[in-house]
From Swiss-Prot:
Lineage: Bacteria, Bacillati, Actinomycetota, Actinomycetes, Micromonosporales
Reactions mediated catalytically: 2 reduced [2Fe-2S]-[ferredoxin] + NADP(+) + H(+) = 2 oxidized [2Fe-2S]-[ferredoxin] + NADPH
Keyword 4Fe-4S (UniProt): no
SUPFAM superfamilies for the chain: FAD/NAD(P)-binding domain (SSF51905)
Name recorded for this polypeptide: Ferredoxin--NADP reductase
Gene3D superfamilies reported for this sequence: FAD/NAD(P)-binding domain (3.50.50.60)
Enzyme's top EC category: oxidoreductase
Cofactor section: FAD
PANTHER family cross-referenced by the UniProt entry: THIOREDOXIN REDUCTASE 1-RELATED-RELATED (PTHR48105)
Entry GO MF terms: ferredoxin-NADP+ reductase activity; flavin adenine dinucleotide binding; NADP binding
Keywords: FAD, Flavoprotein, NADP, Oxidoreductase
UniProt-listed Pfam families: Pyr_redox_2
Length: 322
């Protein structure tokens, strides 16, 4: 059985910053994630997209943000346990023991859960499933692959508009279709896309895709109107994701609609178990990468005091003594 001060579950931005902060506090740390590389949803879903709401960066690509976070934690030598998943939580002498897939166990001083949305599955576009991999995509790891393509984006959230903004300079044409008139995306993101040569069609749905082995066109039907056939060779379905917390639901955590309820110290209802990032829920919660960073620091600082009651909650600034 391995022993570690802090086990971080989830290697997304919040988890990577928690790993840095645990090291900064002189704590040994292991980071567990089911994905094969660090970065969580950023790496899996939008590594090339520009992120505009991280403090200090007017814009930064997803993969660059993750690389910076990994480099920031590197001096403290966090142990990455990737491609595996935390399945069980038990206690021995009041300390958490994580059971990992494959049978390995981690004895921890504290656990910090930063699993984002848990495991995530894209919501399907019903008319498009037979073209999956041959014209219909849910992620665009390499936007340059869509250079000179006619791209149809389906959805009205931030991801849909972010893809429109990212792909417009590359693609031959970009059309965004949403089944409602109002968008879930941030108003500034919508305004940025409206200023681009992107066609936006509201109150409409994709009712049929054309093509043999690959997509060649899409029928769009506006509510109460006739269908319009567009030349399309790539459809980006940005319809959101269904989240699955997996084994976490069996640990006895207090949950609220697939989120872990925490208090102002980021503590859960379980002893020595904290959480941070998108997976958490509390009054006034805002799900941003930026807020996840602060929550990660709060969780680790409070975990440090639980591990060693003689420790100070506030460890000083990282610039002290420099």
């Amino acid at each position: 059985m391995r022993e570690i001060d802090v086990a971080v579950i989830g290697a997304g931005p919040s988890g990577l910053f928690a790993a840095y902060y645990a090291g900064f506090r002189g704590l040994s740390v292991a980071v567990v994630d089911a994905l094969p590389e660090p970065g969580g949803q950023v790496t899996a879903m939008y590594p090339e997209k520009l992120i505009h709401d991280v403090a200090g960066f007017p814009a930064i690509r997803g993969r660059d943000l993750i690389a910076n976070l990994v480099a920031q934690a590197a001096p403290f030598d966090p142990r990455y346990l990737l491609g595996t998943r935390a399945e069980k939580l038990t206690y021995v002498d009041g300390r958490p023991v994580l059971g990992l897939a494959g049978g390995e166990q981690l004895a921890c001083g504290a656990v910090v859960i930063t699993g984002g949305l848990g495991s995530f599955t894209p919501r399907p576009l019903p008319v498009a499933e037979r073209f999956l991999g041959t014209g219909i995509v849910y992620f665009v790891p390499q936007p340059a692959d869509l250079t000179n393509r006619d791209v149809l984006i389906v959805g009205g959230g931030d991801s849909a508009f972010d893809w429109a903004s990212t792909l417009q300079p590359l693609a031959r044409s970009v059309t965004l279709v949403h089944r409602r008139e109002r968008f879930r995306a941030h108003a500034a993101t919508v305004a940025r896309v409206r200023a681009l040569p992107v066609r936006i069609v509201v109150n409409a749905e994709v009712t049929r895709l054309h093509g043999g082995g690959t997509v060649t066109g899409a029928e769009i039907t506006v509510r109460g109107g006739a269908a319009e056939l567009l030349p399309v060779d790539t459809v980006v379905a940005a319809l959101g994701f269904t989240a699955d917390l997996g084994p976490l639901t069996e640990w006895g955590l207090r949950l609220d609609r697939r989120h872990i309820v925490v208090d102002s110290t980021m503590a859960t209802n379980l002893p020595r178990v904290f959480a941070a990032g998108d997976i958490t829920e509390y009054p006034g919660k805002v799900r941003l990468i930026a807020t996840g960073f602060g929550e990660a620091a709060t969780a680790v600082n409070n975990a440090a005091v639980v591990i060693d009651p003689a420790a100070h909650l506030f460890p000083g600034h990282s610039s002290d003594g420099s």
